[in-house]
Design a protein with these regions (language model features):
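Metal-dependent nucleotide-binding catalytic modules
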Residues: 1-47
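A short, aliphatic-rich beta-strand micro-motif
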Residues: 162-170
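Helix-loop-beta substructure at the N-terminus of cytosolic sensory domains
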Residues: 64-101
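Regulatory loop-to-helix N-cap segments in sensory/regulatory domains
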Residues: 43-45, 183-201, 208-212
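Regulatory sensory and allosteric helical modules in signal-transduction proteins
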Residues: 110-147
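GAF sensory/regulatory domain recognition
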Residues: 90-118, 122
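Signal-transducing coupling segments at domain and membrane junctions
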Residues: 142-162
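Short regulatory/linker helices and ligand/cofactor-binding micro-motifs at input modules
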Residues: 37-41, 52-69, 77
């Protein structure tokens, strides 16, 4: 079952940005994708992990910070707080023809991150809908009859997790990329009472990118 939360908090009206526009100058270019491997999430109370992580990110935002480091802080908070198997930040490429994973945490992320990406197309698959229509997706069962046809083949071959989330990131009506995360079992990828934490974490990245442009 897909729970479609739309629209995301922030500037979400989708329009295509100019080709080659530098939409997130604070994110350092990489010749190869960056990744950090983690073991399974710890057993600390998830809600405490989320609240403490959000507070730490808030404190960082009022100091001098590197955007890459802050992205990793957000990913770690998501990974540990929501007990995900894998989390990734995927970025829109400058020509705006492809979204590609750039940072990640979790099991086998070093193998996944270079292959996790997709071309922008007029398609009914979940990833293209997310970035073209500014829609969040929380997938409880990727093999459910109502959603199976919208899960693209590249994803089936690369990850094929039973439950996952797609949270696009928009600033000034332009999509910069998305957060992706998954779990190994079917069921809600984020508990209903923790959805607001995910919105806060995304908004913190939006604030960080805006500050990096000043």
């Amino acid at each position: 079952v897909a729970r479609d939360k739309t629209p995301p908090v922030g500037d979400t009206t989708p329009i295509a940005g100019p080709k080659g526009q530098e939409i997130a100058p604070g994110i350092e270019p990489t010749s190869g994708e960056k990744e950090i491997s983690h073991d399974a999430p710890d057993k600390e109370e998830p809600r405490s992990i989320l609240m403490n992580g959000i507070q730490e990110i808030t404190n960082t935002l009022v100091e001098d910070f590197k955007l890459n480091d802050l992205i990793l802080m957000i990913l770690e908070t998501m990974f540990r707080g929501f007990c995900f198997n894998c989390v990734m930040f995927c970025m829109m490429e400058p020509k705006r023809t492809r979204v590609q994973a750039r940072f990640g945490l979790g099991r086998d992320v070093d193998k996944l991150i270079g292959n996790f990406g997709f071309r922008l197309e007029k398609s009914s698959d979940l990833f293209n809908i997310a970035v073209s229509q500014a829609r969040d997706f929380l997938i409880d069962d990727s093999n459910a009859p109502t959603i199976k046809a919208q899960v693209p083949q590249w994803y089936r071959k690369t990850v094929n997790a039973p439950s996952f989330i797609i949270y696009p990131i928009f600033i000034d009506k332009i999509c910069l990329g998305l957060f992706y995360a998954d779990k190994e079992n079917e069921g809600p990828p984020i508990p209903e009472d923790q959805l607001n934490f995910m919105k806060i974490l995304r908004n913190q990245l939006i604030i960080a990118i805006k500050q990096s442009r000043l």
